[in-house]
């Protein structure tokens, strides 16, 4: 399983999502919209995104941290 995490600095839910992925040994690519990526690129990937994190697992949009936690709990 591989993940993409759209994030920004000083975002507690982004930090929690990355920590959860690390604890499950799931590789992820972080796309920080305050550094190497833009908000426009995020909106191309997730047109209705209103918040970060926006998380993809194996190229499928999961949603934010709460949805990620639910999905990973269900797949245990």
Model regions: which residues?
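Local sequence-structure signature of Cys/Sec-based thiol-disulfide redox active-site neighborhoods
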Residues: 1-26
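C-terminal alpha-helical interaction module
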Residues: 2, 43-44, 74-76
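Short alpha-helical
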Residues: 12, 37, 63
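Alpha-helical elements of the RecA-like P-loop NTPase motor core of helicases
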Residues: 15, 40, 70
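Conserved beta-strand positions in the Rossmann-like core of class I SAM-dependent methyltransferases
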Residues: 29
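Thioredoxin-like thiol-disulfide oxidoreductase module
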Residues: 32-48
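Structural micro-motif
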Residues: 46-55, 65-66
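Non-catalytic, surface beta->alpha helical segment in thiol-disulfide oxidoreductase systems
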Residues: 57-76
């Amino acid at each position: 399983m591989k993940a993409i995490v759209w994030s920004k600095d000083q975002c507690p839910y982004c930090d929690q999502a990355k920590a959860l992925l690390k604890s499950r040994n799931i590789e992820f690519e972080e796309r920080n919209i305050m550094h190497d990526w833009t908000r426009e690129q995020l909106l191309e990937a997730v047109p209705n995104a209103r918040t970060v994190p926006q998380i993809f697992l194996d190229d499928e949009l999961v949603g934010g941290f709460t949805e990620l936690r639910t999905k990973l709990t269900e797949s245990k």
